[in-house]
Amino acid sequence: MGRGKVELKRIENKINRQVTFAKRRNGLLKKAYELSVLCDAEIALLIFSNRGKLYEFCSSPSGMARTVDKYRKHSYATMDPNQSAKDLQDKYQDYLKLKSRVEILQHSQRHLLGEELSEMDVNELEHLERQVDASLRQIRSTKARSMLDQLSDLKTKEEMLLETNRDLRRKLEDSDAALTQSFWGSSAAEQQQQHQQQQQGMSSYQSNPPIQEAGFFKPLQGNVALQMSSHYNHNPANATNSATTSQNVNGFFPGWMV
């Protein structure tokens, strides 16, 4: 997949510019060498860096000077001498104009940086002040637009985060509601099961009552008073105590405890 179209302009970052220059220079030298070997072509390549350092490549065994001389003879041999002189004069005039323009721009740049202001008169200083004010307004306007754009982006991100937060909160509430419903459903089922077990136990208790054990004291069979009275009636000596004995037996305590 291609990287897309690269905009050709000067790289502002100094380090990146140097790195790019080194990579592209080596690539260009390599391509020139490959072309000279593959196609048996005579190639001369001259590269000057922005610091003025020279990098060259020449495929001719005789060297760069001979190749350049060959190029000079080939280029100027077909030119008219009069036309060549006129072109050189025109180019020299263009060079002088460009040089003057560069000097004016450099001078103006130094003024904008606050340098060499002593040689300027009041009108020039006022003109420079208006230029600086216009530049400041332009800079502030650009800064304000940039800050507004950033603020708009931040608001958009904030709305997205709030929407995500609401979705997460809604999911959490639904999860809690489902968990609570499941808990109460299981509790109700357990209570219903316990109630059924209690109902089953009560019905079983009613259908099969427990056998009561005999008490510690058993009831007396028959009329104890009559038995004891008849027993004592056989003995005349005890006839007088029959009533007392009958009362003691019916009251469940002996006479000596009275």
UniProtKB/Swiss-Prot annotation:
GO terms for molecular function: DNA-binding transcription factor activity; protein dimerization activity; RNA polymerase II transcription regulatory region sequence-specific DNA binding. SUPFAM superfamilies: SRF-like. The keyword Nucleus applies. Residues 88-178 form the K-box domain. Residues 186-214 are annotated as: Disordered. Keywords: Developmental protein, Differentiation, DNA-binding, Flowering, Nucleus, Transcription, Transcription regulation. It comes from Arabidopsis thaliana. It comes from the Eukaryota. Residues 191-200 have a biased composition (Low complexity). It is found in: Nucleus. This is Agamous-like MADS-box protein AGL3. Residues 3-57 form the MADS-box domain. Residues 201-210 have a biased composition (Polar residues). One of its GO terms (biological process) is sepal development. SMART domains: MADS. Gene3D superfamilies: Transcription factor, MADS-box. Forms homodimers. Interacts with TT16/AGL32. Disulfide bonds: none annotated. One of its GO terms (cellular component) is nucleus.
